[in-house]
């Protein structure tokens, strides 16, 4: 009788591979009704959500509506923020890209107007408003690539809070264990060549190499689909091609 390998179990979606939804507070998105008018609000709380690499802030608007958004560095509880057209260009405020000057650092940028924010949401990240071209704006992303987006898309002025998160070492495996438990994945990750042959196609033998070609077809069965899946190139030729780019 065969044995299902780890990638098959992950694809089935057992409880250890699922997101810990009961630990989540709420999605961090901009309100839908703040596209064409100016709204004011107050940051009521700055919270920590397990599994999220940034703080999350609860904002209460003048009309009593509440929403959560990703705070930039420098904001504090009780601070007043502005959202929408005509807002002041100030850290923590949310404006359409058409009203943000060139060279400004922004975070939680929308890709499409009204989607709530998709770009530069991780701790310490930001995008740069590179230039304005009519009804479009060129953004320089954290990856240094440039992207053309609609000028009506909203963004938060500033850099996402928590920039020094990765500078502190874990020091102990137990701390790392509890950190990884909040994420929808299994940890630690074991190499296939370190497994038994019954657990992985690369396992077995008194050596730490696969012992067979690691390229498999796109149409391979699930128990065989590990390694370089439908790879055009592997090895030195692939590295040389990447260097030339």
Swiss-Prot record:
Pfam families: Ribosomal_L2, Ribosomal_L2_C
Bias kind Basic residues: ranges: 230-245
Coiled-coil features, chain-numbered ranges: none
Annotated GO biological process: cytoplasmic translation
GO molecular function, one term: rRNA binding
Listed InterPro entries: NA-bd_OB-fold, Rib_uL2_dom2, Ribosomal_uL2, Ribosomal_uL2_arc_euk, Ribosomal_uL2_C, Ribosomal_uL2_dom3, Ribosomal_uL2_RNA-bd_dom, Translation_prot_SH3-like_sf
Residue span of region Disordered: 198-245
Superkingdom in the source lineage: Archaea
Subunit structure, interactors included: Part of the 50S ribosomal subunit. Forms a bridge to the 30S subunit in the 70S ribosome.
Family per similarity comment: Belongs to the universal ribosomal protein uL2 family.
Stated role: One of the primary rRNA binding proteins. Required for association of the 30S and 50S subunits to form the 70S ribosome, for tRNA binding and peptide bond formation. It has been suggested to have peptidyltransferase activity; this is somewhat controversial. Makes several contacts with the 16S rRNA in the 70S ribosome.
Matching HAMAP family: Ribosomal_uL2_A
Stated name of the protein: Large ribosomal subunit protein uL2
Organism: Korarchaeum cryptofilum (strain OPF8)
Annotated gene: rpl2
């Amino acid at each position: 009788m065969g044995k299902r390998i780890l990638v098959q179990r992950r694809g089935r979606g057992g409880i250890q591979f699922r997101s810990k939804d009961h630990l989540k507070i709420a999605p961090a998105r901009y309100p839908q009704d703040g596209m064409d008018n100016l709204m004011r609000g107050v940051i009521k709380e700055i919270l920590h959500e397990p599994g999220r690499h940034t703080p999350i802030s609860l904002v209460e608007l003048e009309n009593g509506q509440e929403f959560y958004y990703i705070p930039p560095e420098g904001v504090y509880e009780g601070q007043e923020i502005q959202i929408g057209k005509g807002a002041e260009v100030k850290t923590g405020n949310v404006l359409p890209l058409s009203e943000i000057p060139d060279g400004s650092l922004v975070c939680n940028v929308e890709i499409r107007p009204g989607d709530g924010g998709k770009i530069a949401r991780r701790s310490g990240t930001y995008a740069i408003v590179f230039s304005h071209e009519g009804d479009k704006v060129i953004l320089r992303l954290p990856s240094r690539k440039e992207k053309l987006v609609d000028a009506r898309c909203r963004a938060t002025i500033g850099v996402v809070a928590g920039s020094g998160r990765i500078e502190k070492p874990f020091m102990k495996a137990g701390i790392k264990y509890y950190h990884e438990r909040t994420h929808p994945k299994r940890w630690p990750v074991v190499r296939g060549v370190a497994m038994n042959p019954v657990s992985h196609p690369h396992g077995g033998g008194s050596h730490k190499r696969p012992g067979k070609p690691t390229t498999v077809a796109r149409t391979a069965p699930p128990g065989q689909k590990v390694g370089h899946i439908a790879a055009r190139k592997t090895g030195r030729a692939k590295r040389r091609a990447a260097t030339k780019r």
